[in-house]
Amino acid sequence: MELQLRDHTEGKLQPSQERLAEKALAQAAERLDVPEQAEMSLTFVLNPEIRELNRDYRGIDRATDVISFAIEDDDDLANLPAEIRAELPVELGDLVISIDKVTEQALFLNHSADRELGYLLVHGFLHLNGYDHEEPADEEKMFTLQEEILDGLGLSR
């Protein structure tokens, strides 16, 4: 999977956090059997930027921890021949994570910033791949998978 990583944190993002992001997303992609030609972006921001995105796209005027913008819509590709679809990159979408919220929530929840970052990465990635937690059965499925991936990264609760 191709990952485009952007850092809008004015120096707050640590190299170890970038490495964790790459590792967590690669492991999640492998677990979900995401095609190698899949593409996504990950942008790390500060609270003011994610607050603006949250307000503009979700109508909620406060900072949040992660926002997922899924791009791929299978309906758009359904009319193309299978051999052409197989050659096209799979556009998963964009994740935006507030590095400020990673720190705040890790302190509040009394666990490591790595655990919090891993959680947000995997949670957002699952949303990009069609998982949600609107219904109890879907929530159980998503959260179980999420914890299994985090356990595999050594980021257990």
From Swiss-Prot:
Annotated EC: 3.1.-.-
Enzyme type, top EC level: hydrolase
Gene Ontology process terms (BP): rRNA processing
Cofactor note: Binds 1 zinc ion.
Cell compartments where the protein resides: Cytoplasm
Keyword annotations: Cytoplasm, Endonuclease, Hydrolase, Metal-binding, Nuclease, Ribosome biogenesis, rRNA processing, Zinc
Cofactor section: Zn(2+)
Positions of Zn(2+) binding: 123, 127, 133
One Pfam family in the UniProt entry: YbeY
Family per similarity comment: Belongs to the endoribonuclease YbeY family.
Functional note: Single strand-specific metallo-endoribonuclease involved in late-stage 70S ribosome quality control and in maturation of the 3' terminus of the 16S rRNA.
UniProt-recorded name of the protein: Endoribonuclease YbeY
Organism encoding this protein: Limosilactobacillus fermentum (strain NBRC 3956 / LMG 18251) (Lactobacillus fermentum)
Lineage: Bacteria, Bacillati, Bacillota, Bacilli, Lactobacillales
